[in-house]
């Protein structure tokens, strides 16, 4: 059986860091960034829940630099690896204007066994 991945309606989204999302130093809280990355990964996985286990079997998050108040950020997804048993999804967050990376996250999912 071939695994056909349904791509989400969008492969990226943008947001502006606002006052409620930053610390006293005006840096974006890492928990806010993590939630945005995680929810975007879920948007990719949910349409594929009939063929993929929805809980990631592996996860890695790499913070590269801080984001600050009023910065425009772009979150993108990309399939990094796909075979008959496993899918690795890469989520990247970068500054919109300079394309400087803020963080990268990889989520590894297994395909459900055919019944």
Residue map of PLM features:
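Hot-dog-fold acyl-thioester-processing enzymes
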Residues: 2-55, 114-115
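HotDog/MaoC-like acyl-thioester-processing domains
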Residues: 3-4, 67-69, 79-115
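Residues in well-ordered beta-strands of folded domains
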Residues: 16, 62, 108-110
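Generic secondary-structure boundary/loop-capping signal
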Residues: 19, 58-60, 99
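Broad hydrophobic/π-residue packing in well-ordered secondary structure
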Residues: 19-21, 33-36, 63-64, 69, ...
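Hydrophobic beta-strand-centered segment that forms part of the acyl-chain substrate-binding groove
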Residues: 41-79, 85, 103-106
């Amino acid at each position: 059986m071939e695994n056909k991945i349904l791509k989400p309606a969008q492969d990226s989204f943008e947001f502006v860091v606002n006052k409620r999302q930053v610390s006293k130093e005006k840096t974006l809280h890492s928990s806010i960034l993590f939630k945005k990355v995680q929810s975007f990964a879920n948007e990719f996985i949910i349409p594929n829940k009939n063929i993929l286990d929805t809980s990631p079997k592996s996860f890695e998050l790499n913070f590269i630099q801080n984001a600050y108040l009023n910065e425009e950020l772009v979150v993108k997804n990309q399939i990094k690896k796909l075979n008959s048993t496993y899918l690795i999804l890469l989520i990247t967050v970068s500054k919109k204007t300079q394309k400087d990376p803020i963080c990268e996250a990889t989520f590894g999912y297994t395909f459900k066994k055919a019944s």
